[in-house]
Regions:
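PLP-dependent amino-acid enzyme catalytic core
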Residues: 1-209
């Protein structure tokens, strides 16, 4: 179960490790409300995924860390896991679809991870990561379906409430559900009146459908 204690612990663990990213006023999108952007594009590795990956790996047992970690990703989760593993001295293997952007692949390698390029799409990379986990004994770091991942991503919600106490609506991507789950937990526990709206692209609206 995802708890507020986990979110607060994640914020404690991540303090001094990740960037506390700013909320930036936006004047170019709409003039019908006061709009702010939570700029996690300024996060180390360039995306919020570092938050969940780092907290998940930090809370593994010594035995789980010693086995090394494995993940599958086409980009941002890969870099988050690689960064966190390097920071903690843990071997990381990342399965990436061959069609992923070269910049993402090279960035993952630059953080010291062993990259396995897998023919096909994301589902093929996921299957290969599970196969290697079972064969080699690695600890699998899921990109979203994990309470520790959600807690790490949810620190965005805590930060927004601390930076914008009067916020009355937060709009966030849904994706696999890790980010919005963590943000919604933080916001609805601490400020129930604030709306949390999830959005998806029409062409990939799996949660909506």
């Amino acid at each position: 179960m995802l708890t507020m204690a986990m979110l607060h612990d994640a914020q404690r663990v991540l303090s001094g490790v990740i960037n506390r990213t700013p909320v930036i006023p936006s004047t170019g999108i709409t003039d019908e409300c006061r709009l702010f952007l939570k700029a996690d594009c300024l996060q180390k590795t360039g995306a919020f995924k570092l938050r969940g990956a780092y907290y998940k790996i930090a809370t593994l047992s010594d035995e789980e860390k010693a086995r090394g970690v494995i993940a599958c990703s086409a980009g941002n989760h890969a870099q988050g896991v690689a960064f966190a593993a390097r920071d903690m001295g843990i071997h990381a293997v990342i399965c990436i679809p061959q069609g992923a952007p070269l910049s993402k692949i090279e960035a993952t390698r630059s953080y010291g991870a062993e990259v396995v390029l897998v023919p096909g799409v994301y589902d093929d990379a996921y299957a290969e990561a599970i196969r290697l986990r079972d064969e080699k004994g690695y600890t699998f770091i899921h990109p979203f379906d994990d309470y520790s991942i959600m807690a790490g991503q949810g620190t965005i919600g805590l930060e927004i409430l601390q930076q914008l106490p009067d916020v009355d609506m937060i709009v966030t991507a849904i994706g696999g559900g890790g980010l919005i789950s963590g943000v919604a937990k933080a916001v609805k526990e601490l400020k129930p009146s604030c709306q949390v709206i999830g959005v998806q692209a029409e062409g990939a609206a799996s949660m909506y459908e």
